[in-house]
């Protein structure tokens, strides 16, 4: 079978809604696009622990602390799950981590902004994770089996994170005037970074058309962004809080909310490493990576020894080791 025939058969399978599995033939560009997307997603989960994780020691109350610890642990697990999905495409975890630490790999823009108040934790959990779940629910319908299955599990856990964030914001919105003002300030700061999460507008996206063709994605960036706005605006206003966009209004003709687009030049700067917290985020990951080196080396030695013992079952081992 020629490459053209293989491609035609592949695209027919994808168009039918069949899942592509690791051992299946796939176009090289499909594989590369998936590695890029899944790698960026995994990096975002790992780096995404940092903005909220700093608030664990200062969380207001034992229950808030426990839920925040659980959320940060979930994000670490999501990152590992996604790295494993990328490994099925031939990219090693070590390669992906090196690309992150060297600044070569990209991750979500939204994690490069500061979190100066407790309200930021609530707004990230509510707004940012809602935007993430809307995007990830779409990815769960995608054509690559390991990625789609990972998305289903991640969305289930992220729904808990949304509830955690929403509950925190509700408490602030119903609290003192100072607490409500803190919640509003956080929404003001996170609104546009959250809108940017879906990626550049379709007219500027170099990857969307091919990702849609091969069902790596089933909705465009603009469609996902609009779905988020339609979902979240009524919730914000129901709490007596404001959407920080005077042009945001419901359009009866379209059935959607109109809104002011983000500054796409800002998105480009932040994604390319020039955001408010890019350097600090990568520095924190480098520090954690270096401090965890002994664990990785110990696991590698243990794995080598175990393989050796499997190959040589007659080797005597010290039971006291």
Language model segments and positions:
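Conserved alpha-helical segments that form or flank metal/cofactor-binding pockets of metalloenzymes
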Residues: 1-9, 71-99, 166-169
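Internal, conserved structured core segments that host functional sites
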Residues: 111-164
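Alpha-helical scaffold segments that form or flank carboxylate-/histidine-based iron centers
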Residues: 30-41, 59-78, 121, 146-158, ...
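Acidic, low-complexity proline/glycine-rich segments
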Residues: 1-21, 43, 95-105
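Helix-loop segments that flank and shape redox-cofactor active sites
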Residues: 25-30, 48-70, 132-147
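Extended, helix-rich structural scaffolds rather than catalytic motifs
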Residues: 181-306
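Short, basic, low-complexity termini and linkers enriched in Ser/Thr/Gly/Pro
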Residues: 305-321
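Acidic/His metal-coordination segments adjacent to aromatic residues that form catalytic metal sites
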Residues: 19-39, 99-125, 142, 175-179, ...
